[in-house]
């Protein structure tokens, strides 16, 4: 066995010791005050009449879940810290991987919002050169998260020695690449030799004495030359890295909690930008910026400054990262319109990238919409979650259904230690040598491109990039042998250069049509009420906007009201709200919001209809769609027996339990038609129902039913053929067992058809209408504790309407 085979373990041990030694002094703080409540600023906590109570962090706890508290302490810098870098460290002893559900804080220092504190960001630099005896007021706006019930709050002041910590990162960054490097390869051997020599220079016999610090300095000088100069300058592979924190607008939390998450995370980003001049950050979703602007305008102004400096990139295209399966085409256009307009007006930035890392599939109509909205590029990672088939390309042209092509790149970042054979990649990347090398190995278009995009940082309240990631970036920017060379680059810069690099390259592949996501198939149907409300409001807005335009000579166009309504629609199309993958509380909020929107739209619409509709006894019907329609129209409480158009055509009116209906022909697109009220004309009934009620003849079909209310035959008279296959039933309701392997509200798994029950418990089978416009069959069935109600309308049209309700 060669000594060198153990060098990685030797170096690892020394690095661990240096990490511990870098924390040179620690001073406990214990005399805190606590007050329950969700306060925005210190003055709000002071204005609350409830008193602050003493909180001894050595013996007391605070309690959740889903609770807010305000902590306060006045601390003095110990004299031992005079002239030293002063850090604050916060710990709750909750260390689970999912920071989205763990306690989170926003730190105020002397009344000023300073930094978010979370599992990944526990240390805050208060002063690079502290003054002994100086006093600070430290305050923590605190949220417990939704998972745990009891917490510590352990806060200390500490000195972190920059030279010891610097040597730690000098050594640990190349060391962390070893698992991805070929064991007998030149790069690993070179790095091992250099690190071994550095270890030999370090004198750990008496930490913090003169000899110790001389050895630390000698080791750093040696590495600066032997590693970061002599083994640097390599550019064979580039990793374009952009800091990022993907924040779901709702998911395991409500939108109200997202307002807090974005403030904490963006405050952390801004604080680290003060400490690391090369740090660049990108964030999409103008909705998040709007939340910050409302709550902490001083932080928002800092972002504006960083954008102007070229260090913060507001990019992404849409107002929120919206679902692209259920959202209508018009709403997708509005996502771009509102998103691009906000970033242009607020920051002077014209978005060119659609940034949707976490959305559950992408319609083939998107490339055309993107191109017409001024979007040139598309980025995602979610397709790497496919259940069965790995996406064959990572850089490609995406050709939409009309032939429009969009340059697309899938981020290939792996988790630390993750197999390169896995499908899965992440947009919450760790800027870590193992992850970056793995991302390059996973990348499939190496023949046309040597530059991969890395979005790195913890999301969903995790605060984005960490100091460790930024220290790693600083060293990997040197281009270490065997490692990708890191550069901090905006996503737009990356895509512009990628477009130039692959332009006219015949090896650039093309994907045509929908980018279907082979997973989370249940998101097409989960939380059906919420999905129905979204579609209803989309259609109501089409009505309102057209009628407002037509009536603006008589009634002022409601610009502010429409703008507010669209903001409400767009946020609720976020990819964990509309698909149904958020917690129950989210949908209690959207239920209320949709009801309020519908009431407002109805009032605005009625005001404009009243202004537009001519006086008199006639009936005016509006068609707000973009095509002429001939259809059955619900007429409310219309008393007419028949209606006549200007050409003399007479249309019978049929009374119903809800009012009246009529079939009206050739209603003009985006227009209206007024009908005169006339007496009914005698005509033959268009529907013939058998005496036993189990057969109906319409102008287009003959339909028969069995004893369960299921259709046993649908004969198409025009084409003279039976529609149903022999032995098959129509109007059959079948209930499948929904027990997916992993994600209950997301998934419908491939085996779902293995177990099912047919709904055959017929309670009512009654013909409730038979008139000149339609015949209606009312059916009720029981299943378990539910009742399924149908009113099947047979029309004097080629289609059959089946409104269905399930309690």
Language-model regions, residue ranges each:
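Short "domain-exit" segments at the C-terminal end of structured domains
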Residues: 802-807
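Aromatic/His-enriched, Gly/Pro-containing loop or helix-boundary segments
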Residues: 89-91, 108-133, 318-338, 346, ...
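Gly/Pro-rich turn-and-neighbor structural signature
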Residues: 214-229, 287, 293, 330, ...
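Catalytic and substrate-binding regions of extracellular carbohydrate-active enzymes
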Residues: 559-563, 571-797, 801
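Active-site and substrate-binding clefts of carbohydrate-active enzymes
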Residues: 129-214, 218-221, 234, 238, ...
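Mature N-terminal, pre-catalytic/accessory segment of carbohydrate-active enzymes
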Residues: 1-242
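The substrate-binding groove and active-site-proximal loops of carbohydrate-active enzymes
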Residues: 205-213, 245-260, 284-292, 317-333, ...
């Amino acid at each position: 066995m060669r000594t060198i085979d153990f060098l990685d373990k030797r170096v690892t041990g020394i690095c661990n010791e240096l990490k511990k030694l870098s924390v040179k002094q620690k001073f406990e703080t214990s005399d805190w005050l606590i007050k329950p409540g969700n306060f925005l600023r210190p003055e709000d906590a002071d204005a609350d009449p409830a008193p602050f109570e003493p909180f001894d962090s050595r013996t007391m706890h605070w309690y959740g879940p889903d609770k807010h508290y305000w902590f306060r302490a006045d601390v003095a810098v110990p004299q031992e810290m005079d002239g030293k870098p002063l850090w604050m460290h916060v710990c709750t002893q909750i260390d689970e991987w999912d920071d989205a559900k763990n306690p989170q804080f926003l730190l105020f220092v002397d009344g000023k919002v300073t930094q978010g504190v979370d599992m990944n960001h526990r240390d805050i630099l208060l002063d690079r050169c502290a003054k002994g005896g100086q006093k600070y007021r430290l305050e923590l706006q605190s949220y417990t998260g939704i998972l745990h019930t009891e917490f510590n709050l352990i806060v200390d002041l500490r000195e972190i020695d920059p030279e010891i910590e610097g040597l730690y990162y000098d050594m640990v960054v190349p060391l962390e690449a070893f698992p991805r490097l070929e064991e007998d390869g030149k790069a690993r051997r070179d790095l091992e030799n250099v690190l071994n020599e550095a270890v030999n220079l370090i004198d750990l016999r008496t930490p913090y004495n003169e000899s110790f610090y001389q050895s630390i300095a000698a080791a750093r000088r040696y590495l600066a030359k032997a590693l970061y100069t002599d083994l640097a300058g390599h550019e064979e592979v580039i990793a374009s890295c952009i800091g990022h924190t993907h924040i779901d607008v709702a998911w395991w939390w409500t939108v109200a909690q997202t307002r807090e998450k974005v403030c904490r995370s963006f405050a952390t980003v801004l604080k680290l930008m003060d400490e690391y001049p090369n740090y660049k950050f990108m964030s999409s979703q103008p909705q998040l910026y709007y939340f910050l602007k409302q709550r902490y305008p001083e932080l928002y102004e800092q972002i504006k400054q960083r954008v102007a400096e070229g260090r913060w990139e507001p990019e992404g295209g849409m107002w929120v990262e919206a679902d692209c399966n259920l959202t209508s085409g018009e709403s997708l256009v509005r996502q771009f319109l509102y998103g691009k307009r906000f970033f242009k007006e607020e920051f002077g930035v014209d978005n060119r990238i659609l940034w949707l890392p976490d959305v559950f599939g992408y319609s083939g109509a998107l490339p055309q919409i993107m191109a017409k909205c001024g979007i040139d590029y598309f980025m995602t990672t979610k397709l790497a979650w496919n259940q069965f088939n790995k996406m064959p390309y990572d850089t490609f042209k995406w050709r939409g259904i009309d032939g429009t092509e969009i340059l697309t790149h899938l981020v290939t970042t792996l988790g630390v230690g993750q197999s390169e054979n896995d499908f899965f990649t992440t947009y919450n990347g760790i800027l870590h040598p193992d992850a970056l090398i793995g991302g390059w190995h996973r990348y499939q278009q190496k023949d046309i491109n040597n530059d991969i995009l890395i979005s790195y940082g913890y999301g969903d309240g995790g605060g984005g990039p960490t100091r460790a990631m930024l220290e790693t970036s600083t060293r990997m920017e040197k281009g270490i042998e065997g490692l990708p060379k890191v550069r901090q680059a905006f996503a737009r810069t990356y895509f512009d250069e990628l477009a130039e690099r692959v332009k006219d390259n015949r090896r650039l592949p093309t994907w045509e049509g929908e980018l279907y996501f082979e997973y989370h198939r249940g998101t097409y149907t989960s939380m059906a009420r919420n999905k129905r409300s979204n579609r209803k409001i989309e259609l109501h807005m089409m009505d309102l906007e057209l009628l407002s335009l037509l009536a603006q000579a008589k009634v002022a166009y409601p610009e502010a009201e429409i703008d507010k309504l669209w903001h409400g629609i767009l946020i609720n199309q976020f990819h964990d709200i509309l698909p149904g993958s958020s917690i129950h509380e989210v949908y209690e909020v959207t239920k209320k919001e949709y009801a309020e929107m519908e009431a407002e739209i109805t009032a605005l619409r009625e005001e404009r209809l009243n202004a537009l509709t001519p006086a008199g006894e006639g009936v005016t019907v509006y068609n707000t769609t973009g095509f002429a329609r001939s259809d059955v129209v619900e007429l409310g409480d219309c008393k007419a027996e028949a209606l006549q158009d200007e050409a003399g055509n007479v249309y019978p009116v049929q009374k119903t339990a809800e009012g009246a209906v009529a079939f009206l022909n050739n209603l003009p697109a985006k227009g209206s038609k007024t009908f005169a009220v006339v007496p009914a004309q005698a005509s033959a009934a268009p529907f013939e129902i058998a005496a036993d009620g189990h057969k109906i003849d319409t102008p287009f079909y003959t339909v028969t039913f069995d004893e369960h209310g299921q259709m046993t035959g649908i004969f198409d008279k025009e084409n003279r053929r039976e529609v149903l296959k022999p032995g098959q039933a129509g109007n059959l309701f079948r209930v499948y067992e929904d027990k997916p392997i992993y994600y209950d509200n997301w998934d419908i798994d491939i085996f779902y058809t293995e177990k099912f029950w047919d709904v055959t418990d017929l309670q009512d089978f009654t013909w409730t209408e038979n008139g000149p416009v339609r015949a209606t069959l009312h059916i009720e069935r029981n299943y378990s504790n539910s009742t399924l109600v149908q009113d099947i309308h047979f029309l004097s049209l080629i289609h059959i309407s089946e409104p269905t309700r399930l309690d």
